């Protein structure tokens, strides 16, 4: 029987500091939480200048519909998608941060729900995906104005999702075989995105520990290892 209740050995950043810790790091973690929550709060409200403030200039992000892109390309794609009718919102549920003792690197995990409105065969539905953002933060002076926190990389764990009718009793016909061909953690979201947005969604996005033995399960473990490497001061490619 697979072990679905434990993280892979060696993935916990033992030297990082999290809850409690020195007061100066509590303040730093508060700054990082505000930055992490800025993704859903700023993006959903089209506050693009504020959204840009989350990132360092060379930051890279991953999402289901965009793939791996620079954050400015992600912003451009988000704007184009909105103009074409894409309606994506988020709900934030909680955040944790692991930070180095010298307050130069951190990883913030933000629990959230992605909720996207779709119209399929003239019927409105919401795909809702429970996920965790994973922000790789670094404090650096990138513009000559002094050190500041910014994201270098942003990824997600896509853990489970569902498809809901907007109007009770009205639900479009779903190709269940096609739906079940997608990764378990975000199959409803990707089904609707590919059907309506003209995109090809990546099939190996990180999932939940329960997805062990699948590509999403492998990427789940890899993302934890990358987070540890980041906090250990290593150079990584996400």
Swiss-Prot record:
Signal peptide coordinates: none
Pfam families cross-referenced by the UniProt entry: SnoaL_4
Source superkingdom: Eukaryota
Start and end residues of each stretch annotated as Disordered: 1-20
Family: Belongs to the PEP2 family.
Annotated protein name in UniProt: Uncharacterized protein AN9274
UniProt organism field: Emericella nidulans (strain FGSC A4 / ATCC 38163 / CBS 112.46 / NRRL 194 / M139)
């Amino acid at each position: 029987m697979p072990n679905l209740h434990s993280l892979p050995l060696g993935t916990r950043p033992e030297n990082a500091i999290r809850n409690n810790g020195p007061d100066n790091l509590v303040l730093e973690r508060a700054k990082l939480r505000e930055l992490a929550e800025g993704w859903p709060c700023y993006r959903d409200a089209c506050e693009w200048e504020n959204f840009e403030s989350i990132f360092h200039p060379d930051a890279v992000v991953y999402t289901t519909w965009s793939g791996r892109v620079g954050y400015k390309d992600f912003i451009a794609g988000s704007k184009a998608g909105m103009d074409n009718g894409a309606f994506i919102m988020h709900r934030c549920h909680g955040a944790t941060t692991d930070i180095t003792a010298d307050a130069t690197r951190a990883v913030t995990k933000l629990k959230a729900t992605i909720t996207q409105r779709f119209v399929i065969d003239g019927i409105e539905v919401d795909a809702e995906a429970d996920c965790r953002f994973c922000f790789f933060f670094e404090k650096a002076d990138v513009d000559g104005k002094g050190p500041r926190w910014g994201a270098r990389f942003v990824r997600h764990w896509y853990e489970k999702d569902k498809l809901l009718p907007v109007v009770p009793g009205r639900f479009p016909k779903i190709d269940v075989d096609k739906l079940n061909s997608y990764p378990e953690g975000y199959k409803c979201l990707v089904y609707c995105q590919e059907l309506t947005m003209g995109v090809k969604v990546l099939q190996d996005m990180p999932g939940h520990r329960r997805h062990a033995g699948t590509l999403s399960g492998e990427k789940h473990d890899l993302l934890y290892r990358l987070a540890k490497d980041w906090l250990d001061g290593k150079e990584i490619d996400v």
